[in-house]
Amino acid sequence: MSRYIGPRLRIIRRIGKLRGFTRKKPFRRSFRGRGALQGKVIPPGQHGLTKLFKSRPFDSNESDYLIRLKVKQRLRYNYGITEKQLVKYVRQAKKMKESTGQVLLQLLEMRLDNIVFRLNMAPTICAARQLISHGHIHVNSKKVNIASYMCKPKDVISVSMKQSSLKLVNRNLQEYSQKMSAYKKRLERTLAYVLFQRNISPNMANALEYINQGKVQVNNRKVLLPNYLCHSKDMISVKTDKGIRKFQFSE
């Protein structure tokens, strides 16, 4: 089966972030100026910056065909399938009585390489396909080296008992747990989570409403970003229905 070996960062700059395609992030290809385009990813090519300025921040000037083409390309690159394979899955989905789009996603999600990726045994679907092709994955105690193998309910997916297989999968699982712990620590410092944790708002939706309405100040400055990272000794004041509540944030 053919696989994509070209530049991956260029693809995600064009059609958006794809978790199953690559771990790369276009940090150096984002607009560093001020305004509504700050932080936006610059499209690839010589005239990428010109295309970014032509795009409107709250309205799309893309045609319907271009929107559907991008969605199709996202499916192809994310799941690592060819155009011929995608057409085959679409034809299978059309034969079902249920919604074609929902059945198509179910067929793609039941592929063995995708399930190995969802189990966090590999960082990307491409890496999961490599694990399968090298014989590290077993299905129902039998070695399967076909990445497009369609799994069924109650199938048991396990790792080969070889030392190299266990070492490789354990390393990927440890990297995933470290990444999740870092995300959790970062989430605990966000302004919306701090308001919810201090019982100022009953839920996250109410905390977001306080922030969007401009009722939250940090160090006597109004903050409108829910993902604002609080630092230790920051003074946070919230204007609620029962009055103004102030507290000091501590990690």
Curated annotation (Swiss-Prot):
It comes from the Eukaryota. One of its GO terms (molecular function) is rRNA binding. Keywords: Chloroplast, Plastid, Repeat, Ribonucleoprotein, Ribosomal protein, RNA-binding, rRNA-binding. It holds the Pfam family S4. InterPro entries: Ribosomal_uS4 (IPR022801), Ribosomal_uS4_bac-type (IPR005709), Ribosomal_uS4_CS (IPR018079), Ribosomal_uS4_N (IPR001912), S4_RNA-bd (IPR002942), S4_RNA-bd_sf (IPR036986). It is found in: Plastid, Chloroplast. Belongs to the universal ribosomal protein uS4 family. Part of the 30S ribosomal subunit. Contacts protein S5. The interaction surface between S4 and S5 is involved in control of translational fidelity. This is Small ribosomal subunit protein uS4c. It comes from Tetradesmus obliquus (Green alga). The lineage of its organism: Eukaryota, Viridiplantae, Chlorophyta, core chlorophytes, Chlorophyceae. The gene is rps4.
